[in-house]
Design a protein with these regions (language model features):
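Generic recognition of long tandem-repeat/solenoid scaffolds
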Residues: 5-9, 108-110, 170-172
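Cys/His-rich short segments
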Residues: 25-53, 115-155
């Protein structure tokens, strides 16, 4: 049976913004081209609309990560990858994504286009949706195979149909995980989706139960 993984960067989100620019007074201001995609009521940016707009991303953002890292998250919730990782995905014909460059940097905004439904997974909602844009924030990540659908393709990235406030959750097939690991990609952790028995052990959260779960993580 194939394995599937969730990608996490665990990088410092607050350092990196792609819809805002730094100014001399230490505050951030929104790029003019991105203003239409911010809700004036809840101030959430529609990341899908920003990515799919005809406008390119603005030059100016400084992407700050620890040395050697090739994955990052922006403050808005965009997933960022370096050019080398993008070339790897293209060379190995990985499917399920689109990418746009951030001008004058070695970084690209990654958008997952292959979506799958949730199964036995109930998101947590803290408050009603925005009365203007309608978005309702949910929390929680599907980390088990019984909680989320998986693609039929074996060489693809994928994501749930619904997007958390923190951005898209990036999932990948085992083949893609091995491509990244085998080619020395750096700066992320891949967490394998658990079967139902393993998930029960993880929920127990005891040292004895955790030891039963084998080969759960791939470190990049």
């Amino acid at each position: 049976m194939s394995a599937y993984f969730w990608l996490a960067t665990y990088d410092e989100r607050d350092n990196n913004w792609v819809t805002m620019q730094e100014n001399l007074h230490g505050a951030c201001s929104v790029f003019q081209s991105c203003i239409p995609h911010f809700c004036r009521a809840c101030h959430r940016v529609d990341k899908k609309a920003v990515f799919e707009s005809k406008e390119t991303f603005e030059p100016g953002p400084q992407i700050r990560v620890r040395a050697g890292r090739e994955f990052a998250d922006s403050g808005e919730g965009f997933t960022l990858i370096r050019t080398r990782v993008l070339k790897l995905l293209r060379r190995h014909r990985v499917a399920g994504y689109a990418a746009k460059p951030i001008p004058f940097t070695d970084w690209h905004v990654l958008r997952i286009t292959r979506t799958v439904p949730f199964k036995k997974f109930k998101p947590r909602y803290d408050e009603p949706g925005c009365k203007v844009c309608g978005y309702r924030a949910y929390y929680g990540i599907a980390l088990a195979l019984h909680q989320i659908g998986v693609p039929t393709e074996d060489n693809t990235l994928f994501t749930p149909e619904f997007e958390r406030p923190q951005g898209q959750d990036v999932f990948l097939t085992e083949k893609v995980a091995l491509i990244l690991k085998g080619n020395g990609a750096r700066g992320a952790e891949l967490q394998r989706l658990l079967n139902e028995e393993e998930y029960k052990w993880a929920e127990e959260d005891t040292p004895q139960a955790r030891r039963k779960i084998k080969s759960r993580f791939i470190l990049l």
